């Protein structure tokens, strides 16, 4: 092989540290610039020390991977990963914590391809793939004695450690002050953030001692019966935020269909359990609240649908999203396949109206009291323009591309509002279908989103921000309820009471588990009356 460059291993690792610090860490440098520019007084030495500290720290952690036969493939992979991470951080404002890594591991081909655009391909090619290939055309000279190589590496690490120690001694208070007030900085260092979060995720998901599977609600039973069975639709939205719902005060008419359906109650103070589907969906269907939620426990435990099924309610889950994140694994379910409906499916995704296909037959096959759950594709980004058919393109100009950061704010908001409006159409059509069943069933529909979405506010796009610093756009979600007169009478509900609470009372995903058990009159020890939204508004209290 013809080499274009020749170098010794220790200087080469130091060079890599400089390259990674400069090339892939633009997000943290820009963030630090914003932070420091707002301070009244900043020490010049402190500012100068920042890149020196990062280079020294990266060199310290890079050196152990400078082993012959490992160095080139390891850093080639790191170049590509860092290129992808730096682009998404810079353009979308995302942070690579464990939740983001979980999203990466659980995404499907359709979701992954939605993020592919000319800018990201160009960036990853120039800063990731080409340097990765270039590594193999560099001749690296190693020491002819193993102990000499070990000594050189140890010396390099000691020098790095000495630099870090010296900087800490000189500017400790400055680093503590900036770090304490901006805790997210530690999650912005590339590639440390990706490697650290990935390692933790893999350990917790695959390497910890397996947790015994836990059953829930083995004592579940119905406390009320009716000559007329109940049919309920539970609709799970995707990336819809309360802020853009006209029924919650948004200036645009994004809910023209449900607002005219009659009797729809919109909950204005609803919050999600997480900022990503991988967290929110398992959380809302579990009996754990957001504060104590543990994804590993949830994966090894039954949830809401299991308890309802034990109580004798027929359950069926229809999914037009990636999957149900495990919550429907033990109930009858179907994953919509794009090949099944060429009219409503384009490429590898389908419009949410596809969920209404075959609905009458599915309801007819179920026995007794029935609940169908529908998982919408909703406002899944970044390809918002693919979530609604052309005839539902109400707000224009929209943003017909995946690199949404290159659209104007007007285009992006128009596109997102079109997705909200189209989801509203689907929900309204489900309500219309329930009205057709009123002679045979007491009917009801509950709609809520899994999490919200950022549209460029504060430089953030999409979702998955760490919950403690996530903006309201990612955590404030819509929730709507519609009930037939027969359902209201059967459940002895005071609608004025429910409407009043919906307007002013703060609720969250934590309320879903017990609210569903309560409204279905399921008696079980895992029911918590305090979390039941319906209980205060029933003349006969839930069990």
Labelled PLM ranges:
Residues 233, 419-464, 513-516:
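Metal-dependent active-site segment of extracytoplasmic phospho-/sulfohydrolases and closely related
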């Amino acid at each position: 092989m013809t080499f274009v460059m020749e170098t010794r291993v220790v200087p080469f690792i130091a060079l890599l540290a400089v390259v990674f610090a400069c090339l892939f860490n633009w997000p943290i440098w820009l963030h630090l610039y914003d932070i420091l520019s707002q301070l009244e007084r900043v020490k010049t030495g402190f500012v100068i020390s920042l890149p020196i500290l990062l280079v020294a720290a990266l060199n310290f952690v890079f050196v152990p991977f400078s082993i012959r036969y490992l160095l080139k493939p390891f850093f080639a992979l790191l170049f590509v990963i860092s290129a992808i991470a730096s682009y998404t951080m810079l353009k979308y404002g995302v942070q690579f914590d464990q939740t983001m890594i979980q999203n990466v591991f659980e995404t499907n081909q359709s979701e992954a391809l939605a993020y592919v655009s000319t800018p990201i391909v160009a960036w990853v090619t120039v800063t990731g793939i080409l340097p990765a290939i270039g590594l193999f055309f560099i001749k690296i000279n190693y020491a002819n004695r193993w102990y000499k190589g070990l000594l050189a590496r140890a010396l390099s690490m000691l020098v790095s450690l000495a630099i870090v120690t010296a900087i800490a001694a000189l500017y400790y208070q400055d680093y503590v002050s900036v770090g304490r007030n901006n805790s997210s900085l530690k999650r912005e260092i590339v590639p440390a953030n990706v490697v650290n979060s990935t390692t933790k995720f893999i350990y917790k998901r695959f390497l910890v001692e397996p947790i015994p599977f836990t059953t829930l609600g083995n004592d579940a039973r119905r406390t009320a019966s009716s000559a007329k069975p109940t049919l309920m639709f539970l609709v799970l939205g995707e990336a819809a935020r309360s802020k853009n719902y006209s029924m919650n005060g948004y200036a645009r008419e994004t809910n023209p269909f449900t607002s005219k359906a009659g009797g729809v109650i919109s909950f204005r103070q609803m919050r999600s359990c997480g900022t990503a589907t991988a967290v929110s969906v398992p959380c809302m269907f579990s009996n754990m609240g957001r504060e104590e939620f543990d994804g590993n426990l949830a994966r090894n435990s039954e949830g809401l649908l299991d308890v309802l099924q034990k109580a004798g309610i027929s359950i069926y889950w229809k999914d037009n999203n990636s999957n149900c994140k495990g919550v429907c694994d033990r109930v009858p379910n179907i994953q919509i396949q794009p090949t099944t409906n060429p009219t409503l499916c384009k490429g590898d995704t389908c419009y949410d109206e596809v969920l209404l296909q075959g609905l009458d037959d599915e309801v007819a096959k179920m026995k007794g009291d029935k609940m169908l759950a529908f998982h919408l594709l909703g406002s899944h980004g970044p390809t918002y323009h693919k979530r609604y058919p052309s005839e539902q393109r109400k707000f224009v100009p929209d943003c017909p591309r995946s690199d949404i950061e290159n659209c104007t704010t007007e285009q992006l908001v128009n596109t997102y509002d079109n997705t909200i409006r189209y989801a509203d159409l689907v929900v309204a059509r489900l309500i219309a279908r329930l009205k057709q069943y009123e002679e045979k069933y007491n009917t009801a529909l509950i709609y809520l989103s899994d999490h919200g979405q950022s549209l460029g506010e504060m430089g953030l796009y999409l979702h998955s921000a760490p919950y403690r610093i996530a903006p309201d756009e990612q955590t404030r979600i819509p929730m709507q309820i519609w009930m037939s007169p027969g359902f209201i009478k059967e459940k002895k509900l005071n609608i004025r009471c429910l409407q009043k609470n919906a307007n002013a009372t703060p609720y969250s995903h934590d309320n879903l588990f017990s609210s569903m058990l309560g409204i279905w009159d399921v008696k079980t020890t895992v029911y918590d009356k305090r979390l039941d939204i319906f209980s205060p508004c029933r003349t006969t209290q839930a069990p």
